Amino acid sequence: MKQVVCIVAGLMVFAVCAAAQAPAAGQKVGLATSLQNAYATLKGNLTQAAEKMPEANYAFKPAPDPDLRTYGQWIGHQADNQFTNCATLKGVPSPSPAQGNEKKVTKAELVKALADAFAFCDGAMSALTDQNALQLIKQGEGETARGGVVSALLSHGLESYGIAVVYMRAKGVAPPAAAPAAGRGGPAGRRGQ
């Protein structure tokens, strides 16, 4: 029980920090809604980042290090990760072969792979409730809380988005979350991202 409380507390902190806006006075936002809001923000930012980067920059990586991924490989890697985590959430095999999307090279293929991954995840995320977030589900050879898998999906996605931002800025492309938009930290948008 202590572990479940710690997991829930950690997820609540993560979800609240990841949400784009604080709730209005008197509004109560539960765990599932917080995670769903964070997912929607991640989906918007990553989708826009994939669409906004010019095709010529999909082969870009900031150094010749063979261990670094190109921009396109990061987009494919994120799609692969989403398929894996959302297959776990749904209790089904991943419809995408391991690292299959990371091997794609054209912008069109990678944008589609990311869109397909989000479409696959959308149902799992909309089915999330405060109650089932605590349920243990099969992951690998063991079990973990459904909310823990969602947390892994979000944290990996936020990491991938952060990396994409660095690549975009290196190529002179303003990342999505830096643009002024309603609900993004006010009329000036979120600066410094």
Model-derived segments and spans:
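Surface-exposed helix-capping loop/turn segments at secondary-structure junctions
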Residues: 51-59, 124-134, 169-175
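Acidic/histidine-rich alpha-helical segments that form the ligand environment
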Residues: 102-138, 144-160
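Bacterial N-terminal signal peptides
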Residues: 6-17
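Positively charged n-region of N-terminal signal peptides that target proteins for export
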Residues: 1-4
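Disordered, low-complexity segments in secreted/periplasmic proteins that are enriched in proline
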Residues: 21-27, 102, 179-193
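Short, contiguous alpha-helical
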Residues: 36, 40-47, 58-99, 138-183, ...
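Acidic/histidine-rich, surface-exposed loop or edge segments in extracytoplasmic proteins
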Residues: 22-29, 89-103
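Short N-terminal segments immediately surrounding and downstream of signal-peptide cleavage
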Residues: 22-44
